[in-house]
Amino acid sequence: AIVYLDEIVEARKDTTVIIHPLSDDRRLLPIEKKGQVIEAVDDFMLVISYNPGYQSILKDLKQSTKQRFMAIEFDYPLPDVESRVVAHEAGVSLEVAQRLVKIAEKVRNLKNHGLEEGVSTRLLIYAATLIRQGVPADQACDVAIARPITDDPDMLRSIIEVVKAIF
């Protein structure tokens, strides 16, 4: 059995400590309101995920929780892989997907230089889907890539310039 808790940092701090006895050698989940204790089966795995780049000082895992898990770090997929993912998921040509990934690469370079976070593959798929539905590429990139990641007018202009250069 596998339990997957996505975006664990979004959970209230007082709720994440509930998994402590489940995630250590006790392998138990106490349910206080019912007076029950559930014991994990031998092949039980608890998997949590979160995006460290989206955290603030207020949204981080407690050290006592972090230390109960192995950590694996993922970066964006390689451009050729990401292009194939975008093309497949959005139903656009590989050429359109490659252009969107090129935009993402350029915009991701602005992270920590005015942008808090880069362009996710999800946003590329949203933009590609709009393009497939007939929305002009510049407009699709504006509403699905640029505006979701920044409100800063100068940064928006910069991203739109990147879009114009590639599309």
Model-based region annotation:
Residues A1-F167:
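C-terminal regulatory/interaction module of P-loop NTP-utilizing enzymes
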